[in-house]
């Protein structure tokens, strides 16, 4: 049976006829749903953490079929769903029912408006004369700012030292970065040179709660002891960066913000407004913590279609003089076409099953980045991306992806760099690569630029001086069970709170 209004379907599901009246022109039917549960989303082992908070919230909505106002108590809730209680004798919810406008009301007149669907209904006390029903609601849509506030409230209720996108004192944040050693001498010189521009960028990211950025903070007596952030850097990809923790609390506090991050991904990735099809990060292979967490998770998942790692060589190219116009030799540089990207995808297929390129928005069928770039522009931030093909005798030798963003958006400047994919180093020279990068630098008015080179061996073959190596880690959140299984084991071993998915004493708000 399908019930709808002029705008949308309100209910669809199998029903049995309990009774009906007879009549030639009209009849009345009493129907009963045959199922107590629907499968709205793919079943996962690691679901959002359900919390009971006090005083209990309520939900208020206009019933889509009767038009009557309904108010129900909330039993538990998470970042992507909640459970409510109603009487079995007077129940009004059934699995499959859409609730186009539902207000979730918390203490202190805090209210979140969302769209939801009933996904299950079960009897809680069968033997009681006044038996009750527990009905589960899946959140389908909510305002972006409301979602950040709502999930942040749940994080803080679970651990009063955990914050999501809270107001951060910028002087304290910079002091924290210095004290943790996150900003080392080489990075300090870069920051000091561009300090005013970087300061303005971080004011925007940390005080205006933009849709493109999230930050997770662990505080002890008001002092920042751990930090991690995410930014939507490609159309459907979020970049994890700036993970740091303080002093003797490094391990535990670092794990805490990592747990927040994993929980946020679970709660958020299926909402369309998040545009979170992929999550990625870069780390140095000699850094033990990210290697253990991200590298270990990748090995544990052991499926490059769901999680993969790719090693890039890193160098910095400078344009030493105005006379250096970029000598390409026998090569030609042009805007990359779809056929060039298909050839790149074929080249990279063996290493990451295409996941790395999809995360970088470089696969042939990738969407354009107009919407995301406009989000940056509305905030007064810069975001540009262009892709070029370097060819010799019409044979594709390399692809160059140029990312431009505000200086310091990522403090390793990996959001403001050239990524070089070398398909055939035998048709290239070091001078041609240098010339291509210099040409791009001049056209974009850049004095120097970081360059990431893939595969790593290409830098060695072309005798390009390599300063360091970066590992790019990519994950499909839809298949994140393996990641959570691995990190939960580490969280259990590294914290005194036990399993993050185990039941806990209900916190107060």
Predicted regions and their residues:
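Hydrophobic pocket/interface hotspot
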Residues: 344
């Amino acid at each position: 049976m399908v019930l709808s209004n002029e705008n949308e379907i309100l209910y669809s599901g199998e029903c049995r006829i309990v009774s009906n009246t007879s009549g030639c022109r009209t009849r009345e039917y009493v129907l009963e749903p045959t199922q107590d549960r629907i499968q709205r989303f793919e079943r996962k082992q690691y679901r959002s953490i359900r919390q009971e908070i006090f005083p209990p919230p309520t939900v208020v909505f206009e019933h889509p079929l009767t038009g009557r106002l309904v108010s129900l108590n909330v039993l538990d809730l998470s970042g992507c769903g909640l459970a409510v209680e109603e009487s079995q004798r007077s129940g009004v919810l059934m699995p499959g029912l859409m609730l186009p406008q539902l207000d979730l009301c918390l203490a202190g007149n805090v209210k979140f408006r969302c769209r939801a669907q009933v996904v299950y209904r079960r009897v809680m006390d069968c033997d009681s004369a006044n038996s009750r029903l527990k009905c589960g609601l899946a959140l389908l849509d909510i305002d972006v700012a409301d979602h950040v506030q709502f999930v942040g409230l749940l994080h803080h209720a679970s651990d009063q030292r955990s914050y999501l996108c809270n107001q951060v004192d910028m002087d304290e944040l910079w002091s924290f970065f210095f004290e943790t050693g996150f900003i080392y001498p080489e990075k300090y010189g870069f920051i000091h040179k561009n300090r005013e521009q970087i300061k303005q960028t971080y004011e925007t990211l940390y005080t205006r709660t933009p849709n493109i950025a999230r930050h997770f903070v662990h505080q002890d007596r008001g002092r920042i002891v751990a930090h991690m952030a995410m930014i939507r850097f490609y159309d459907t990809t979020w970049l994890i960066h700036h993970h740091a923790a303080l002093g003797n609390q490094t391990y535990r506090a670092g794990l805490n913000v990592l747990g927040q991050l994993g929980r946020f991904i679970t709660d958020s990735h299926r909402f369309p407004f998040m545009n979170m099809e992929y999550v990625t990060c870069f780390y140095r292979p000699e850094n033990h913590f990210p290697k253990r967490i991200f590298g270990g998770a990748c090995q544990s998942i052991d499926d490059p279609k769901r999680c993969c790692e790719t090693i890039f060589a890193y160098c910095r190219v400078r344009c030493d003089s105005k006379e250096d116009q970029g000598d390409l030799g026998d090569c030609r540089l042009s805007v990359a076409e779809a056929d060039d990207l298909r050839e790149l995808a074929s080249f990279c297929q063996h290493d990451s099953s295409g996941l790395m390129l999809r995360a970088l928005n470089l696969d042939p069928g990738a969407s354009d980045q107009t919407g995301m770039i406009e989000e940056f522009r509305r905030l007064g931030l810069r975001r540009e991306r262009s892709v070029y093909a370097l060819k010799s005798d019409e044979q594709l030798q390399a692809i160059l992806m140029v990312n431009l963003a505000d200086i310091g958006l990522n403090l390793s400047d990996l959001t403001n760099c050239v990524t070089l994919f070398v398909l055939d180093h035998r048709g290239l020279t070091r001078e041609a690569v240098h010339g291509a990068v210099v040409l791009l630098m001049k056209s974009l008015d850049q004095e120097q630029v970081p360059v990431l080179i893939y595969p790593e061996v290409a830098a060695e073959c072309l005798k390009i001086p390599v300063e360091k190596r970066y590992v790019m880690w990519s994950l499909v959140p839809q298949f994140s069970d393996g990641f959570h299984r691995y990190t939960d084991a580490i969280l259990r071993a590294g914290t005194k709170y036990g399993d993050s998915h185990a039941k806990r004493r209900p916190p107060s708000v």
